[in-house]
Amino acid sequence: MNIYNNKKTLFFKLKRNSLKEWQQYTRHKFVISLGEGTLQLSCFKDYLLQDYIFLQKFIKILSLSAYQAKTLEDRNRSVDFIIGIKHELSLHASYCKKFNISKSKLLKTKEKKQNKSYTDYVLSIGVKKSNLELFVALSPCIIGYGEIGHNLSKLKNWKKNKYASWIKMYSSKEYQKIANENIKYLDKLFTKNKKSSYKSLVKIFKKASKLEANFWEMCI
């Protein structure tokens, strides 16, 4: 079964109730042209630079999640994510070298307003809301990239694409496992937080999906 279309999961329900925003994100022209291999290299490089900044802030967000965790299991999960993101940051720097982006260039790049708007929003959720709401805000990123990678890997001749390494990374068994674990974790958090308003979760999911789409847009 396609893990992204399991109708029993909270993720699927949120996606179904945010279909317009979700499709604007996962079917954005940046994603489509990346999958076709027609995305301008300058756009992809800009994305890599901004994504490096995003990943650094992601660590701060997950640190907040670890601090707010009510159980050891939840805290350990957040810590595991932090370790994973730190590893991804080192891989990201190596990956950028393939596109002639130096470490100094990564460190000197200024954050664009669309990037800041996204991370500021997720941080505000982390400060004011529960861990469930925080992970709902993070799910378009964590799970969404898995779905995008999965979908692009189904395209014909994707392996000949100049961005094949990016598609391979997010369609890999390792990343698909991460996405699947997060889908299950959302369900677990939701079960433990029955008092949470579903409408509020949908609102957060929609907003985060819009901000993800804006992230693509800033690189076009």
What are these regions, as identified by a protein language model?
Residues 1-12, 16:
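Basic/polar N-terminal segments that are highly enriched at the extreme N-terminus
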Residues 15-40, 58, 183-192:
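Short alpha-helical hairpin
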Residues 19-24, 39-68, 87, 136-146, ...:
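Alpha-helical bundle segments that constitute or directly flank the non-heme di-iron/ferroxidase center
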Residues 29-42, 58-77, 126-127:
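Helix-loop segments that flank and shape redox-cofactor active sites
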Residues 46-57, 84, 174, 178, ...:
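Short, contiguous, pocket-lining structural segments
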Residues 75-177, 206, 210, 220:
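Active-site-proximal alpha-helical scaffolds that flank and shape metal-associated catalytic sites
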Residues 137, 157-169, 181-201:
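Structured surface interface patches that mediate subunit assembly and partner/cofactor docking
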Residues 188-220:
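Long hydrophobic alpha-helical segments typical of transmembrane helices together
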